[in-house]
Amino acid sequence: MSNYAPFIKPYVEYNEHGWGPCEVPELDVPYQPFCKSDRLGKICDWTAMVPEKKFPSKYASTFGNNSQYAYFYEDDDSTFHLVDTTGSKATKPYQRGRYRTNMRNNVRTRGRTGRGTPNIASLGGSTAGGATASSTKYGKGRHTRNTQNVGRRFGRNAPTRIRESSVMVQSNWVSIEEIDFPRLLKLALPNIKEGKDIATCGSLEFYDKLYDRVNLRNEKPLQKMARVVHTVTTTDDPVIRRLSKTMGNVFATDEILSTIMCCTRSNYSWDVVVEKLGTKVFLDKRYNDQFDLLTVNETSVEPPMEEEGSINSAHSLAMEATLINHNFSQQVLRIGDQEQRFMFEEPNPFEEPGVDLASIGYRYRQWDLGNDVVLIARCKHNAVIQGPNGDMQFLSIKALNEWDSKVTNSVEWRQKLDTQRGAVLASELRNNACKLARWTVEAVLAGSDQLKLGYVSRMNPRDHLRHVILGTQQFKPQEFATQINLNMDNSWGVLRCLIDLVMKQPDGKYLIMKDPNKPMIRLYDVPENAFDSDRDEEEESSEPLSNSNDN
């Protein structure tokens, strides 16, 4: 026999109606609801923990206080009541990760809110440094300008401004192509040679070098020049009509080419009419169009608003900038019957009897863009100057205008122009990047030797009729293009891309339009009579660019 104790098989209960023992009486164990996300801070209720001052409910259950731990007084004292007259302060429940979203903004706030306490005022309560609950970022004494914009740092997530299209898209127009700016920025057409002159027209006056000495202590009032500038489109130019019969297959003006070549810098909507006749393409502008107006602060963070009747609206500023540019380009010349003029081979094609025309010289130039694409464009100069070696140098004269530095939040010219001209120019490059790029492209296309920029400001920010010249500055167009990061190879590539798209289409009329609210170029197929009404209105009320009586 073995010395081991005998093994007795235990009795196992079998529950036919459920799981678990069936003969053991119920012990009335209370059920306590629980949540797996609750923080375990105690193992039993024998002792009470010292609560934290900031988060007294840190270890509380998600389901609140359970009745099994509550103390009930057996005696009934229904006739005795205690009235609490002190106001109760609501405490927010503790939640893990509640302030994790603001950790990025509070990384470097040690010492700003007082004794290194993280800034949580934006979520309620007061900061340790004594700041009020409206403080959001820097604690002490800092209040937000608008309580509805809390969390929109640096203007992010701000509502975008809806711009109007330059032309209303009709239902019978057919969309052919949509090209976004990132695709256009990747284009390049290198090794485009200098344009070849095939015709020169008009006459130029000499630039007055006395305006190079103008500064803040010797400013000059801007005069109103009663001279006329004809802004003739491509198909109405008699010289282009004559040249199109024997040479070239793409025809345009320098304003139209610069608009297309600098389209990736534009924010406002614009459009160019394209007419395809066989193998020839004409790039035109619409009649009764705002195409010739200069934009103001187009690329700034806060461009001008469209306010009816305001002198600082976008349209009023565009009219003001256009007239300033016209007056400045004619005032800085040596005007007079006895003054010398530079004459081109042919007279001004837009000359009219009894009309004092502005000093403009037209150069019709030709470029070979490859793939049997020959471009002919009308370019222009504003003045001529005699170089150090006695040769004639052609100038493109433009004017930048200041209207209200406080509204635009830019550099004040009357304080910085003489001492920090680079800062002034950098501010203009930021606010008017598209306009300066267009001027540079026009000067490069025309073959100008110098690009003369004038700084013109209002005598009073509230007076848009009187201006003063504060200074001038000159650049070489090719060097200035490099300074403003203008890639001419990319500009030629954008132009060639749009020309190739039109060349693939059948004969007809098309429209190239910049989308008003998206960085995108759209190509539409439009009917032949799409803009005939605009042309009739233009012929009824057509006036060349000059100064009106109220300007």
From Swiss-Prot:
Positions of region (Disordered): 108-152, 527-551
Comp. bias (Low complexity): 115-136
Subcellular location: Cytoplasm
Any one Pfam family match given in the protein's UniProt record, by short name: eIF-3_zeta
InterPro entries noted in UniProt: eIF3d
Annotated region described as RNA gate, given as residue ranges: 290-304
Gene Ontology MF annotations: mRNA cap binding; translation initiation factor activity
One GO BP: regulation of translational initiation
Major localization class: cytoplasm
GO cellular component terms, A-Z: eukaryotic 43S preinitiation complex; eukaryotic 48S preinitiation complex; eukaryotic translation initiation factor 3 complex
Record key words, sorted: Cytoplasm, Initiation factor, Protein biosynthesis, RNA-binding
Family to which the UniProt record says this protein belongs: Belongs to the eIF-3 subunit D family.
Subunit field text: Component of the eukaryotic translation initiation factor 3 (eIF-3) complex. The eIF-3 complex interacts with pix.
Function of the molecule: mRNA cap-binding component of the eukaryotic translation initiation factor 3 (eIF-3) complex, which is involved in protein synthesis of a specialized repertoire of mRNAs and, together with other initiation factors, stimulates binding of mRNA and methionyl-tRNAi to the 40S ribosome. The eIF-3 complex specifically targets and initiates translation of a subset of mRNAs involved in cell proliferation. In the eIF-3 complex, eif3d specifically recognizes and binds the 7-methylguanosine cap of a subset of mRNAs.
HAMAP family (alphabetical): eIF3d
This protein's domain notes: The RNA gate region regulates mRNA cap recognition to prevent promiscuous mRNA-binding before assembly of eif3d into the full eukaryotic translation initiation factor 3 (eIF-3) complex.
Protein known as: Eukaryotic translation initiation factor 3 subunit D-2
Species per Swiss-Prot/TrEMBL record: Drosophila simulans
